[in-house]
From Swiss-Prot:
Keyword Flavoprotein applies: yes
Organism of this sequence: Bradyrhizobium diazoefficiens (strain JCM 10833 / BCRC 13528 / IAM 13628 / NBRC 14792 / USDA 110)
Protein name per its UniProtKB record: tRNA uridine 5-carboxymethylaminomethyl modification enzyme MnmG
SMART domains with a match to the protein in the record: GIDA_assoc_3
Binding site for NAD(+): 273-287
Family matches, as InterPro entries: FAD/NAD-bd_sf (IPR036188), GIDA_C_N (IPR049312), MnmG (IPR004416), MnmG-rel (IPR002218), MnmG-rel_CS (IPR020595), MnmG_C (IPR026904), MnmG_C_subdom (IPR047001), MnmG_C_subdom_sf (IPR044920)
Gene Ontology CC, one term: cytosol
Subcellular location as annotated: Cytoplasm
Disulfide bond entries: none
Any Pfam family hit: GIDA
GO biological process, one term: tRNA wobble uridine modification
Broad class of the protein's primary localization: cytoplasm
Length: 626
């Protein structure tokens, strides 16, 4: 783990969720990689809530896992309560989530980093990017040490000129108790990047031994718990329950009487916070007609009495936070371990990036995580793995890879960022994806692992596991389609079918809403030999089969436009474009015609002109070669 060299193929700055995935992915690709972090002991720290996954976010965890990333396996090692959200809804919108033990999670992540071959850890503060002729060539630390690099991935989280706010007080910090990164922001500005400011927040931490648990509703996890990673056979960590309580009218009165002391409302903070994770004072101001707001009481560990009250993020003064807590059922006598706070930090407009997460301004420089304007561990991890594998490819001189909107939520998120930019911290939701039926959490490995194998970021153990699983799934699908039955025979087995004389296969029967795997297995005993995991995949495929056929046509049309590459086009030479459209295209520099179509204000006519121009140029090139 100790650096034995002064130059690396890839240097990753930051040991958070994005940085760990980037560094590990780069090393798996065979690149000599260094992870630069203030202290190795903080690697894998969960700065805010002690949980992984959720709606949309769980899809990202599964996709990171499909590319042999760390978060899924580490989440399984540290998970102390697993739940699949939206379980009553269709598989496309279900979100796997795990409550985590902070210590177990960090320990598992640190172990994974230590065990990654080809990955060194450098403790120190990154201070300045070394740039030569528009390309990053190395990194200078605050203590004067310099390291050369073929590529650099920056994953600084909230540390870029971080500033914590608590009531009327504020002080520089990357998170509570840790210094911010000041020099890197200046380095970005010298390179010509425009920096913006964003804000996020965290709730107070509570002493769980002082909570009246009898006054709150208890919420158990799923039994048995469902792991994130396909490489995890079963969860062996002890499982816990969480509590649920609500704010009251008295809570709201305390907040209204003191809202002027909140940095967000006093004018002390002018940057935007996450719309879908508002502070409790924001909730009361924006949703003043509600009687109460739900609070989840989430234990932070098996041997830690600290509790995270999910739902009351705040930066109000400490004494106000104590008054708020005292007005909430179950928390009347609670002791506050640490007050909540808000933090402001620098970010870069993600439209400065191309879809590989490489900056357009400096070659060899990749960005991932909150520096790109996202919020959340899972969003950071997803960007980290893409940036890390592309940084390794760039360092070796190989072609970079793009994950598009039909590949997965990774592609949806990155395309949203680099095409549309952000005005507030970006969070993933299933509603952001056009191809939700295809991009399910349950089939992430089926969609992405072969791509990861081809790229070189998937190790041999997972490759063998994946191909064995796919052989079993294909064999089960073939068998289920070969077993057929008449309507009369099906009715004798208790199934409700039209008497139309048409034979139907076991696979076709499972497409019916009221027929599942258990019913068809009862008819054909040979299906009993199929592994339950494979059977679940098969049933979901059958339910969605007709819809997936329709969606595949949409994906094919999407891919046609994504195949028309615009990266080298001089828009002044394209006849028929309006000056307004030319200006939009010059500013955005879209990668493909498909991406151009997602720029605000782009017209169908302009897209037709671009597609026709590219086809004409391709024909000219073909004739010239001939």
């Amino acid at each position: 783990m100790r650096p034995e060299r002064e130059s690396f193929d890839v240097i990753v700055i930051g040991g958070g969720h994005a940085g760990c995935e980037a560094a590990a992915a780069s090393a798996r690709m065979g690149a000599a990689t260094a992870l630069v972090t203030h202290r190795f002991s903080t690697v894998g720290a969960m700065s805010c809530n002690p949980a992984i996954g959720g709606l949309g976010k769980g899809h990202l965890v599964r996709e990171v896992d499909a590319l042999d990333g760390l978060m899924g396996r580490v989440g399984d090692a540290g998970g102390i309560q697993f739940r699949v959200l939206n379980r009553r809804k269709g598989p496309a919108v279900r979100g796997p989530r795990a409550q985590a033990d902070r210590k177990l999670y960090a320990a598992a992540m640190q172990a994974a980093i230590r065990e990654t071959e080809g990955l060194s850890v450098i403790e120190g503060e990154a201070d300045e990017l070394i740039v030569v002729e528009g390309r990053v060539t190395g990194l200078r630390l605050a203590d004067g040490r310099e390291f050369g690099a073929g590529s650099i991935v920056v994953t600084t989280g909230t540390f870029l000129r971080g500033l914590i706010h608590l009531g009327e007080k504020n002080w520089p910090a990357g998170r509570v108790g840790e210094a911010p990164a000041m020099g890197l922001s200046s380095s970005f500005e010298r390179a010509g990047f425009t920096l913006g400011r964003l804000k996020t927040g965290t709730p107070p931490r509570l002493d769980g031994t002082t909570i009246d648990w009898s006054a709150v509703e208890m919420q158990p996890g799923d039994e048995p718990p469902e792991p994130f990673s396909v490489m995890t056979d079963r969860i062996t960590t002890p499982q816990i329950q969480c509590g649920i309580t609500r704010t009251t009218a008295a809570t709201h009165e305390v907040i209204r009487a003191n809202v002027h002391r909140s940095p967000m409302y006093s004018g002390q903070i002018k940057s935007s916070g996450p719309r879908y994770c508002p502070s409790i004072e924001d909730k009361i101001v924006r949703f003043g007609d509600r009687d109460g707001h739900q609070i989840f009481l989430e234990p932070e560990g098996l041997d830690d009495s600290t509790v995270y009250p999910n739902g009351i993020s705040t930066s109000l003064p400490e004494e106000v936070q104590l008054a708020i807590l005292a007005s909430i059922p179950g928390l009347e006598r609670v002791k506050m371990v640490r007050p909540g706070y808000a933090i402001e930090y620098d970010h870069i407009d993600p439209r400065e990036l191309d879809p590989t997460l490489q900056t357009k301004r400096l070659r060899g420089l990749f960005l991932a995580g909150q520096i790109n304007g996202t919020t959340g561990y899972e969003e950071a991890a997803g960007q980290g793995i893409v940036a890390g594998l592309n940084a390794a490819l760039a360092a070796s001189g190989a072609a970079l890879t793009v994950f598009d909107r039909a590949d997965g939520y990774l592609g949806v998120m990155i395309d949203d960022l680099v095409t549309r930019g952000i005005s507030e911290p970006y969070r993933m939701f299933t509603s952001r994806a056009e191809y939700r039926l295809t991009l399910r959490a349950d089939n992430a490995d089926q969609r992405l692992t072969e791509k990861g194998i081809a790229l070189g970021c998937v190790r041999s153990a997972r490759t063998l596991h994946h191909r064995t699983k796919m052989e079993a799934l294909n064999a089960a699908r073939t068998l289920s389609k070969s077993l057929t039955i008449t309507p009369n025979e099906a009715i004798k087995h208790g199934l409700s079918l039209n008497r139309d004389g048409q034979r139907r296969s076991a696979f076709e029967l499972m497409a019916y809403p009221d027929i599942g795997w258990s019913q068809v297995r009862a008819i054909w005993l040979e299906l009993s030999a199929i592994d339950p995991v494979i059977a679940t995949h098969l049933e979901i495929d059958a339910k969605y089969d007709v819809y997936l056929e329709r969606q595949s046509a949409d994906v094919e049309a999407f891919r046609r436009d994504e195949g028309l590459v615009l990266s080298e086009v001089d828009y002044q030479l394209v006849p028929g474009l309006s000056n307004e459209v030319r200006a939009k295209l010059e500013k955005a520099r879209p990668f493909t015609v498909g991406q151009a179509g997602r720029i605000d204000g782009m017209t169908p006519a302009a897209l037709g002109i671009l597609a026709a121009y590219l086809r004409r140029e391709a024909r000219k090139t073909s004739k010239a070669i001939a």
